[in-house]
């Protein structure tokens, strides 16, 4: 009798564990409590009918029952939750409600990300600024749209990229608001960055200070006395560029792109004009000479007839005399 009760209790406990793994925690907890109380009461009645049930056994059973259900949740269901972080209204979203780690992961994935300035340098009348963001965001996105606009409204620029950095050409002494929007590959949802305020006057100031410090250090090194024995070594390491006439002549000449933009259209216009001239000369309508020849023939016949009539009149006059 005792062995049969023990087997029934084990079967009921296994059934409660299976039901607790498939259902929610709120439903599995009271079921395990009721089963543990019934198991403990049956064991106590079988061993000693007059003794009361030990409450510690019931609590130990309830503490160990939900542990097998939490192990699979940390594996498959957590992965499902992370896959559906972007789809908050999908069917699998209820997996994220019971895990603190998963909800934190989802909040990080949906929250706006930060931008950082990698490099800035002055080139002629522009400030070339490199900005970057997290590479994981760029890898998980199809494309990222960078938008920069002048603070207060005005000039707006856009740039598409599939990497985690971009180079922007900004005006000096201007404040810009820069923002990046990335589209996820699987879900198609847009994720935005925090707006980055960039003052190009401060960026150029930092770059110029660094360059002046470097130039001053180079001048100090050049002003130091150098021994004649080490003159060859220093000449190999330090080479000061000196401009020549050839450099100035080459810099004064136009670039190939500028030259092509002027010469090629001129040659094209000249060739088009020559083609029109040839077409006009060879395809113009020719004058008809046949009517002119007929008129000349008629005039010739008239002249011949008049001359013959004059001769006949002269012959007649001589005969009459």
UniProtKB/Swiss-Prot annotation:
It is found in: Membrane. Involved in the normal targeting of ventral muscle, muscle 12, by motoneurons. May function as an axon guidance molecule involved in neuromuscular specificity. This is Transmembrane protein fend. Residues 1-18 form the signal peptide. The chain crosses the membrane at residues 262-282. The keyword DNA repair does not apply. Its main location: membrane. The keyword Signal applies. One of its GO terms (cellular component) is membrane. Residues 283-321 are cytoplasmic. Disruption phenotype: Homozygotes are viable and fertile, display no obvious abnormalities in the development of the CNS, PNS or muscles. However, they exhibit highly specific defects in the innervation pattern of muscle 12, but no obvious defects in the innervation of other muscles. Both loss and gain of function mutants display altered neuromuscular specificity. It comes from Drosophila melanogaster. Keywords: Membrane, Signal, Transmembrane, Transmembrane helix. GO terms for biological process: motor neuron axon guidance.
